[in-house]
Amino acid sequence: LLSRRVDLLLLKSLRAKVCAYLLSEAEAHHSLTFTIPYSRIQLADYLNCDRSALSRELSLMQRDGLLETYKSSFKLLEPDALRHMVL
């Protein structure tokens, strides 16, 4: 768990951090639709960013058709595109 967080924090962009986190959660849940155990504030803290920046990035990703989100629930619509953003 700690090494996963360190790997996330080494990524440069917030979008890459969000993509890596959501892809790892999808893998852990064996589904592209899942609920995370964090609020937006807790997730922002986990990713070491401001809550407002996280909310803005998630809104942009939703607008771009990459995912759907409501509170702590997510549906990854374009997992291959998300994987590409982590590289």
Label for each model-derived stretch:
Residues 1-16:
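A small-molecule sensor/coupling module
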Residues 5-7, 21, 46:
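Short acidic/polar alpha-helix capping motifs at helix-coil junctions
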Residues 17-24:
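Pre-recognition alpha-helix immediately N-terminal to the DNA-recognition helix
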